[in-house]
UniProtKB/Swiss-Prot annotation:
Keywords for the protein's UniProt record, in alphabetical order: Detoxification, Glycosyltransferase, Nucleus, Transferase
InterPro entries, alphabetized: UDP_glucos_trans, UDP_glycos_trans_CS
Protein name: UDP-glycosyltransferase 72E1
Class of the enzyme per the UniProt entry, highest EC level: transferase
Reported function: UDP-glycosyltransferase that glucosylates coniferyl aldehyde to form coniferyl aldehyde 4-O-glucoside. Glucosylates sinapyl aldehyde to form sinapyl aldehyde 4-O-glucoside. Is not active in presence of coniferyl alcohol or sinapyl alcohol. Can glucosylate the phytotoxic xenobiotic compound 2,4,5-trichlorophenol (TCP).
Originating gene: UGT72E1
Subunit structure and binding partners: Interacts with SIS8.
Catalytic activities: (E)-coniferaldehyde + UDP-alpha-D-glucose = 4-O-(beta-D-glucosyl)-4-(E)-coniferyl aldehyde + UDP + H(+); (E)-sinapaldehyde + UDP-alpha-D-glucose = 4-O-(beta-D-glucosyl)-4-trans-sinapoyl aldehyde + UDP + H(+)
Null mutant phenotype: No visible phenotype under normal growth conditions, but mutant plants display a sugar-resistant seedling development phenotype.
Keyword Transferase assigned: yes
Binding site for an anthocyanidin: 18, 391
GO biological process, alphabetically ordered: lignin metabolic process; response to toxic substance
Length: 487
C-alpha cells in the first residue's frame, strides 16, 4: 500500500476539557496540514456531556476518524475515593495494550503519536512503531512551566514553597503563589505526587511539546519555555504554541432552546454560569449563588447541577440533574425558578457553550476557569467572573484577573469557604453593569483579535507551529518511503 500523506494517532483523556481541544487539533491537522487523523477516545456513559458532545452536530468531526475504546475496569487498581486525576491516569495506562493492537492492525501506520498529560505512558509506543511523539498540553504555558520546573526543585526550594508557603520562582516567569499551586505538587507522600511529578522527566524524551496558548495570552512564560537559557533548558525539545484551540461556532448546526431564548435578549445583557463538565458546588454554596443571582437582577443562563459533599471535582465524568419541585430543582431555594423565569434560563445537562459564549446577548461568564472554557470566552470576547475549583484553575484565575485584567474574582478562594450572596451580587453587577466590567470587555475584545491573528494561515504563530510539525512528519514519511524502495 502506497503511503501518500502523514498519519497522526491521538490519544485523548475523558472529559470535555480534554476531548474538545484534541478534536479541534485533529481537525486542524487534517484540514490545513494534510494529515490523516485517528483519535482514540475512551467510551463513557451515554448520558455524559462527552457522549452528548461527540454525537452532536456541533462536534463536526468529519475530518477525523474517532475510534471509541472500552473503558477499562480499574476498580481493583484504584481506591473508589481516589482523586479523579489518579483514576484518569490509570484508565489511560490500562488502555495502552488496546491502542497497541489497534495500531498493529492499521494498514497505514501513523507517522506521529500525540498524547495528552494523562497519556504519557503511551510515549514508548513511538519507538515500537517508528512514530514521532508529541505531548499535547490542553491547558496553558503556565501549567507546562510548573510541570517541567517542579521536579527540578532541590529540598530547600521545595521546603520554601510547600512548608513556608513562599511563592515559587521560575526562570523568566511570574512567581506562582502557594495558594495557586496544584494540589498535585503539595504532598510528596501522596499517590498523586508520586504519579505526576516524575512525568517531568518524560517531556525531554519526546519530539516536541504542543501547548494550547499563544504569545499575547502568555508572553513571558512562552518566551521562557522557548529560551534554552531559561525553562527551555529543562524542556529540552521544541515548544509549539498552537492556541487557541476552541470549537468553531456554526449556529445553523446547533439546535438548543437556550439559543432561542438568547435570541430574544438585549446585546451583552446575559451572564452565563457554568462550572464545566466536572465542577460542582456544595449545597450551601449553590444556595448562596442562586440568591446572589436573584439579588443582582441580571439576566442569566445557568448550567446547574446537584450539590456534592465531596471535592469540587466529584462530578467529573458523571451527570445527574436532581429532582424537580414546582419547576425548581430540589437543591435550589424554593420558588427560585418562578421568581427569575423572566430573566433566567436553567440548563440541567450539556449546553452548547461555544455557541452561548459567541452569542451577542452574552456579556459575562461565571466560570470555574478550566482552560477550554477560558479560551471559548476569549474567542467570544466575553469578560469573566473567575471561580476556580481544582487543578490548575487557581493559576488560571490569577492570570485572568491580575495579569490580563479580563476577570473579577471573589476575595477568597471558593475552596476556603462559602462565597456569600452579597459578594456574588456585587461581582455579577461589577462585570455586567459597572465601569470595571466595561473596561474588561474592551481588553478581552483586543485579546480576541490576537487570538484570530495567531490562527491566521498567513503567518499566524499557531499555523506556523503546526506547519513545522507537519514538515517533521513529511521528513519521516520520506525516510520510510526510501527504506521501502531499498534506498
Amino acid at each position: 500500500m502506497k503511503i501518500t500523506k502523514p498519519h497522526v494517532a491521538m490519544f485523548a483523556s475523558p472529559g470535555m476539557g480534554h476531548i474538545i481541544p484534541v478534536i479541534e487539533l485533529g481537525k486542524r491537522l487534517a484540514g490545513s496540514h494534510g494529515f490523516d487523523v485517528t483519535i482514540f477516545v475512551l467510551e463513557t456513559d451515554a448520558a455524559s456531556a462527552q457522549s452528548q458532545f461527540l454525537n452532536s452536530p456541533g462536534c463536526d468531526a468529519a475530518l477525523v476518524d474517532i475510534v471509541g475504546l472500552p473503558t477499562p475496569d480499574i476498580s481493583g487498581l484504584v481506591d473508589p475515593s481516589a482523586f479523579f486525576g489518579i483514576k484518569l491516569l490509570v484508565m489511560m495506562r490500562e488502555t495502552i495494550p488496546t491502542i497497541r493492537s489497534k495500531i498493529e492492525e492499521m494498514q497505514h501506520k501513523p507517522t506521529a503519536l500525540i498524547v495528552d498529560l494523562f497519556g504519557l505512558d503511551a510515549i514508548p509506543l513511538g519507538g515500537e512503531f517508528n512514530m514521532l511523539t508529541y505531548i499535547f498540553i490542553a491547558s496553558n504555558a503556565r501549567f507546562l512551566a510548573v510541570a517541567l520546573f517542579f521536579p527540578t526543585l532541590d529540598k530547600d526550594m521545595e521546603e520554601e514553597h510547600i512548608i513556608k508557603k513562599q511563592p515559587m520562582v521560575m526562570p523568566g516567569c511570574e512567581p506562582v503563589r502557594f495558594e495557586d499551586t496544584l494540589e498535585t505538587f503539595l504532598d510528596p507522600n501522596s499517590q498523586l505526587y508520586r504519579e505526576f511529578v516524575p512525568f517531568g522527566s518524560v517531556f525531554p524524551t519526546c519530539d516536541g511539546i504542543i501547548v494550547n496558548t499563544w504569545d499575547d495570552m502568555e508572553p513571558k512564560t512562552l518566551k521562557s519555555l522557548q529560551d534554552p537559557k531559561l525553562l527551555g533548558r529543562i524542556a529540552g525539545v521544541p515548544v509549539y504554541p498552537i492556541g487557541p484551540l476552541s470549537r468553531p461556532v456554526d449556529p445553523s448546526k446547533t439546535n438548543h432552546p437556550v439559543l432561542d431564548w438568547l435570541n430574544k435578549q438585549p446585546d451583552e445583557s446575559v451572564l452565563y454560569i457554568s462550572f464545566g463538565s466536572g465542577g460542582s458546588l456544595s449545597a450551601k454554596q449553590l444556595t448562596e449563588l442562586a440568591w446572589g443571582l436573584e439579588m443582582s437582577q441580571q439576566r442569566f443562563v445557568w448550567v446547574v447541577r446537584p450539590p456534592v459533599d465531596g471535592s469540587a471535582c466529584s462530578a467529573y465524568l458523571s451527570a445527574n440533574s436532581g429532582k424537580i419541585r414546582d419547576g425548581t430543582p430540589d437543591y435550589l431555594p424554593e420558588g427560585f425558578v418562578s421568581r427569575t423565569h423572566e430573566r433566567g434560563f436553567m440548563v440541567s445537562s450539556w449546553a452548547p457553550q461555544a455557541e452561548i459564549l459567541a452569542h451577542q446577548a452574552v456579556g459575562g461568564f461565571l466560570t470555574h476557569c478550566g482552560w477550554n472554557s477560558i479560551l471559548e470566552s476569549v474567542v467570544g470576547g466575553v469578560p469573566m467572573i473567575a471561580w476556580p475549583l481544582f487543578a490548575e484553575q487557581m493559576m488560571n484565575a490569577t492570570l485572568l484577573n491580575e495579569e490580563l485584567g479580563v476577570a473579577v474574582r471573589s476575595k477568597k478562594l471558593p475552596s476556603e469557604g462559602v462565597i456569600t450572596r452579597a459578594e456574588i451580587e456585587a461581582l455579577v453587577r461589577k462585570i455586567m453593569v459597572e465601569e470595571e466590567g466595561a473596561e474588561m470587555r474592551k481588553k478581552i475584545k483586543k485579546l480576541k483579535e490576537t487570538a484570530a491573528e495567531s490562527l491566521s494561515c498567513d503567518g499566524g504563530v499557531a499555523h506556523e507551529s503546526l506547519s513545522r510539525i507537519a514538515d517533521e512528519s513529511e521528513h519521516l514519511l520520506e525516510r520510510v518511503r526510501c527504506m521501502a524502495r531499498g534506498a
